[in-house]
Each structure stands twice: as C-alpha cells, then as structure tokens.
Amino acid sequence: MEPKSQDQAPNRDDPDLQTEPLTIAQSITSFYMYNPYEKRSVEVPLTNCDAFISLLKCVIGTGILAMPLAFRCSGFVMGTVMSILLMILLTYSIHLLIADMTECCRRRRVPQVSMPEAVRIAYEEGPKWINCFGRAAGFMTTCVLVFGQFLLCTVYLVFVSKNFKEIGDHYIERYNERYYVLVACLLLLPLFMIRRLKYLVPLNLISNFLLYAGFALIMYYLFNGLPNINDREMVTPPVEWIEFIAIAAFSLTAVGSMLVVEAHMAHPQSYLGLFGVLNLAVLFILLSNMFFGIIGYWRFGDNVHASITLNIPQDEILSQFIKVFIASGIFLSYPLNGFVVITVMFSDYENSEPRGRYRTLIEYVVRLLFLFLTGAVAIGVPNLAALTELEGAFSLSNLNLLCPALIDVFLNYNVGYGRLMWKLIRDILLILIGLIFGIVGCTVALMQLIRDFQLTLNSM
C-alpha cells in the first residue's frame, strides 16, 4: 500500500486514529506514545536548505523595502528596539503554535494537522461549553488564513505594477497603473498553476537572487549623499508607533507560509530549536530589515515612500535595473504565497468519489479565481502603504497572537497551566496584545484605503 500523501487530510473514520479527547494521564504521556514526525509522508519533501530558501522567499519581499517608512514612524532608536522585541514576540508565537499543532497530532494520533484543524481540536479539548464551536472556529481560522495571504498577494501585485510603471513611463506612453496589474496577472497565470511546493524551489532561488542583486545595487543610492544623522529623529511621538508595528509585522513574518514550509520538510524536527531552520531564517530577516530600515530612513528622511525603490531616480539605467530585479523577484514570490492559500483551502477536502476525480480541476479553478480576485483588489485600491499596514495588522493580531494563544489555552485546560498559572497568564497577555493592536492597526489602515477607494471612484 502506498503511504498517504501529505496533501490529503487524515481519514477520521480510521479506527486506529484517536478522535476523542484524551484523559490527563494520556495527554501527559502522549509525547512518548506517538511521534507524528515519524509518521509523516511527504510526496516531494523539502531539504533543510530548501526550507531555509523558501522561508527567506516567504518573508523577504516588499516588507523589507517598506522598513525605511517604518523607521520614519519610529525613529532610529525606537525602531531598532521595537524591531527586536517584535521579532522575539512573533518568533515565540510561531514556536508556540507549531508545538501546539504537534501536540494536537499526538493527541489524535495523526501525522499532521493544519492550523484550522488544530483550532478545532483545541476547542474539543477545552471546556465542554465550547466543544460545539470547534468546527465553526476551524472554518473561521481558514478564512483568516486565506484573507491574510490574499492581502499579501495583493500587495505584491501593487508593488510590481508600480515599479514597472515607473520604468514603462520612461520609455513608452504613460499607461494607467491598473493596466500593469492586469498584465502581471496574465503573466503569473502559468506560474501559479504549479501544484507542488518542491517545484517552486527553483523559482524561489531565482527570486532570492534577483532580490539580493537589487538590494546590493540599491546600496549605491542609499549610501550616496547621506545627510547628517542628527537631522533624523531618534524617537518619534508614540502616536506614530502603531504604523511602525503594522509595517514591521508585515515585513517580519508570514505565518501561513511558515507552516506550509514546515509541513513539507523531510526532517521537520530541524525546523524548531535554538539553531533550527526557523530561528536562523528569522535572525537573517531581522538583521536585513533593520539594516534597510535604518539606512533608508537616514538617506531619505521624511520623504521616504512606501517602497524605497520609489525614491531612487526614474531616468537612470542603474535605478531601472534595480527596479527590474526587485520587481521581478517579488513577481516570482507570488506563486509561493498563493500556494499557502490553496494548501489551507484544500487541507480538509474530502478525496472521495465523485468529487475526488475532479479535485485537480477544482484546484485549478480556485487558483484562477484567487489570482484574478487579487488583481481586482489591486486595481481598485492601489495604495501600497495602506495595504501593507492592513495586512501586517490583520495577520499579526489574528495569526501570530490570537490563534496560538487560544489553541494553547484550550489544549492545556485539562492538563494544567503550570506553576502560578504562568501559561494561562502568558496566553491572556498574547490575546490582549492581539486584540488591541488588531483593532487599532486595522482601523487606521482601513480608513486610508476607504479614502483611496473614493479617490479611485472620483477619477473614473
């Protein structure tokens, strides 16, 4: 018998699978009774190097180019401090989430669960009065994951169209930016139809090369003509910090992509840990983001745009090469981040007759709809800064803080929260931070988008 494909959901009718909540004794010993990593079967697995490359590709993109704008909202000192603290918080929450998802696998005796499945299992393990909300909570988590990745892919399309428009305006007739969005969608169509993560690794490698080549070339403009550093703010008023957090959150993490990479690894045990793939990747990402944020703000000050590529000259050959490299790198990032959406949407898809025969066709249709829906939103509200802030605030609050904390609260309900209830206190703090930041950050970004959409309607 062939091993079960990684892309298929476990058969919950299998009598060998545990479907009922475990007792306290069973929960405590579950680690020693079942190791889900040994049971996983991935059709085309990622090596640790593949996973590292894919993680960099997931996170490094338009966010790093927006970090100078983030530092404009915080100042040098406060931006550095908040970047480090935010990365520690986000990385810790990812570790907590993956550890809890692994515990869900042990309790249900299955090789792997998706994030929505983990939420459902956690609700079933919690107090009796919330057990009935498990499926609804799992469905809501799916919606949150899909919407977060939808916003991210929309940001990518807006970024690509803006940069290629600047190049096009110099050589050909000035066309509306929305035409560039449409062309980008058409060119992405064949790449977005790739259905195996392993086969996206070459694209990710090319994308990383283009991005870092562009980053290296842009140093010429960043270091040429640096003003006196005393002309820049060290600490800005606290009212502006919320924008920094939203932009930095967008540039520092991508929960859905991080989970998909871990799920497709040949050796997922190497993902976490002090010197695991995840920690090494986020350290590299943090240093890169801080460097770009500090140098970009130092060079351009209050005139910095939502992407640093929009600050460099439009009519110079070097600047045009930079924009082509970086925009092409971001363009090639879209298939990987869109892959996350498809994985989430089909993780619980029943591979039964007759629908199983049409699963591939349905997946292609969903991919097509997703691509052109992101294009439609990019055409309607091409505000790069506001979209970046909205995606950062939405994903940080829901995926990085609320979901991991709620899963942990309910999973530990029967087992206990440790001495002085420290786990419960930690989870409550994560929930409060997520709620406050989510409400404030999303409100600010949505107000900007509404104003921009009104301007779009008036210009038609």
Curated annotation (Swiss-Prot):
It is found in: Cell membrane. The name 'polyphemus' derives from the Cyclops in Greek mythology that failed to guard against Odysseus as mutants are unable to defend against microbial infection. Disruption phenotype: RNAi-mediated knockdown in adult blood cells results in decreased survival following infection with S.aureus. Adults infected with S.aureus display decreased phagocytosis, increased bacterial load and increased production of reactive oxygen species (ROS) in the hemolymph. Phagocytosis of latex beads is normal, however flies pre-injected with S.aureus display a significant decrease in subsequent bead phagocytosis. Increased survival following infection with L.monocytogenes. Increased extracellular glutamate in the hemolymph. It is a multi-pass membrane protein. GO terms for molecular function: amino acid transmembrane transporter activity; L-amino acid transmembrane transporter activity. This is Glutamate transporter polyphemus. It comes from Drosophila melanogaster (Fruit fly). Coiled coil: none annotated. It comes from the Eukaryota. InterPro entries: AA_transpt_TM. GO terms for biological process: amino acid transmembrane transport; defense response to bacterium; phagocytosis; sexual reproduction.
